[in-house]
Amino acid sequence: CIRDRDMRLEPFFKALKKCVVEYLDHFAIDKSTFEVNFVKSWFTICDPGQHFPCHHHSCSHISFVYYLQTPGDPLILHRKNPNEWFGDAFKLITENRYNNGDGYAITPKAEHLVMFPGHLEHYTTPEDREHRRISLAGDIVLTLKHRTDTESGLLPPRYWKQF
């Protein structure tokens, strides 16, 4: 059964689009070049003692999490550290420093939005807590608005072909 798009969240996604444009501006990306496409979104309810294992969103350019209710447990963003000379070298450290870490923890609050590259591995930890964590998460794909004269960027779906 194909259903029409649920419009109850339209005001949220319009506000989120403005945040995505600000996010692109933070990196000095020409905002007028891209369409912001919300390709997936889902609600997540995480009960006490539950956690999400390390994963990434391979088909997404930008991923987001909007926290509706949170007991304060961290979201860990994980990246491969370019300073590491060989695999797992930084598992042998004696002290955490800015140049030898591979993770960044964010302790979100209710009504906070976190955006990050979809390829960035992330997870939550199994913290002792009394309350559920409830969030709305999703994936964004950026497509070129008008340009077809560049090797960079994803062409709009109107140029895609299926055979």
Give the ranges of each region predicted by the language model.
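Catalytic core of non-heme Fe(II) oxygenases with the double-stranded beta-helix
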Residues: 46-115, 132, 142-154
